[in-house]
């Protein structure tokens, strides 16, 4: 006889217990892993009578019961490593945790949200001001200028802008010639060809 399947598609969903784990449940899970090893988490409920689903058993072991999980506060070295990895990987906590020995993705995520994100919120502003890695620049008025000078400098005639754009192409050759001074005949001929190309004489 087939088991009744709930609307969510999980078999025997009502059989599993949710919420905090007890000391007795932890001991059952640890004894099972010691005897059978990790993996096949869905078999634990059948073989041990533990009323927990396979996913719950796996997460409990990986995040709390495994002897490889490091306890205690994060060190400065771990903080620095997490910050560097987060700049590269973003919020990919499982990938970050794999590169932080002894820490789980759950530990790293919680520590980031409760400590590092707030800490970096203060440091980011200081860092951006000190290292110069600013993408957008804000042009502030020169403090030595008077208010009238600032207003005059900010007024731009549309006709002048259009005139500058029209003259740009005609001044291209003069601009290049002002940057280059050659005495060698070959270099002079090469430069002449470049000037002709800019002026539209070469096809």
From Swiss-Prot:
GO terms for molecular function: DNA binding; DNA-binding transcription factor activity. Induction: Transcriptional activation correlates with reduced histone acetylation on H3 and H4 mediated by HDA18 in N cells. Repressed by CPC in hair cells (H position). The keyword Lipoprotein does not apply. Signal peptide: none annotated. Residues 13-65, 66-120 form the HTH myb-type domain. InterPro entries: Homeodomain-like_sf, Myb_dom, Myb_TF_plants, SANT/Myb. One of its GO terms (cellular component) is nucleus. It is found in: Nucleus. Restricted to roots and hypocotyl. Specifically expressed in root non-hair developing cells (atrichoblasts) at the N position. Also present in lateral root cap cells. In hypocotyls, expressed within files of epidermal cells located outside a single cortical cell equivalent to roots N cells (at protein level). It comes from the Eukaryota. Residues 41-65, 93-116 bind DNA. One of its GO terms (biological process) is root hair cell differentiation. Keywords: Activator, Developmental protein, DNA-binding, Nucleus, Repeat, Transcription, Transcription regulation. CDD domains: SANT. Interacts with GL3, BHLH2/EGL3/MYC146 and BHLH12/MYC1. Transcription activator, when associated with BHLH2/EGL3/MYC146 or BHLH12/MYC1. Involved in epidermal cell fate specification in roots and hypocotyl. Together with GL3 or BHLH2, promotes the formation of non-hair developing cells (atrichoblasts) et the N position in root epidermis. Regulates stomata spatial distribution in hypocotyls. Binds to the WER-binding sites (WBS) promoter regions and activates the transcription of target genes such as GL2 and of CPC. This protein is called 'Werewolf' because plants lacking WER exhibit hairy roots. This is Transcription factor WER.
